Regions:
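Alpha-helical DNA-contacting segments of helix-turn-helix folds
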Residues: 60-67, 112, 128
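Amphipathic alpha-helical linker/stalk segments
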Residues: 63-90
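N-terminal intrinsically disordered/low-complexity leader segments
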Residues: 1-12
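Helix-turn-helix
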Residues: 12, 16, 24-58, 62
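Amphipathic alpha-helical packing segments from all-alpha helical-bundle domains
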Residues: 69-73, 89-92, 96, 100-107, ...
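Membrane-interface starts of transmembrane alpha-helices
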Residues: 6, 148-160
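Amphipathic C-terminal alpha-helical segment
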Residues: 101, 134-139, 160-178, 192-197
Length: 197
């Protein structure tokens, strides 16, 4: 972001820009979303948009950052709300939450994932990794006799990245010979088997 909004009015303007961007991506696709279209949909002039963002990509990166932060918070809330349920039940719930988030907002994430090579430098993946790692630490700390910190760190990294990549690839290119439900079961089984090692 070029200029972080400080006043409430500025924050509202940025929120309008981000919401309009999400709507434009859903309506026109990522490649055909332009700053003038965002301006038209948001009711914010192109000049005002450029006060906050250098270009369309910077707007999308901020939207990705915020959505990743929200997904991370939702995962933390899910884990805390579930209390001490066994991992065999918690992992499928977390995977379901992830799939729902990737498909939400009229396919925003799906459209961005189709062009991930343009946004792979975004903070979104690091934000999700951080939240998921914290969830892993919280979850595994309930079984301290089973894993030490180094094991948790290593297993979390592998689980987070392999699961995220698989889910992202599936929702962005849904032409695989596996149903979503079957993939969810396979991911859960894979994670549980890996944790049992």
């Amino acid at each position: 972001m070029r200029k972080a909004p400080q006043q409430q009015r500025s924050k509202i303007i940025v929120d309008h820009i981000l919401e309009a961007t999400q709507q434009c991506i859903a309506q026109y696709g990522l490649l055909h979303t332009t700053t003038p279209k965002i301006a038209e949909k948001s009711g914010v002039s192109v000049g005002s948009i450029y006060q906050y963002f250098e270009n369309k990509d910077q707007i999308i990166e901020e939207l990705l950052r915020r959505k990743s932060e929200l997904l991370g918070q939702q995962l933390k809330e899910l884990v805390i709300q579930q209390g001490n349920i066994p991992l065999e039940l918690l992992i499928p719930l977390a995977i379901e939450l992830g799939f729902n988030a990737l498909k939400a907002d009229h396919g925003f994430f799906i459209e961005v994932l189709k062009h991930w090579h343009d946004y792979s430098h975004s903070q979104a993946a690091q934000i999700l990794e951080k939240h998921f790692f914290e969830v892993g630490l919280y979850t595994f700390s309930r079984n301290p006799h089973q894993w030490d910190f180094e094991q948790v760190k290593h297993k979390s990294f592998v689980i987070i990245n392999s699961t995220l990549f698989t889910m992202m690839r599936y929702v962005s290119q849904n032409n695989f010979l596996i149903s979503e439900q079957q993939l969810k079961r396979e991911l859960s089984s894979m994670i549980l088997a890996y944790l049992s090692q």
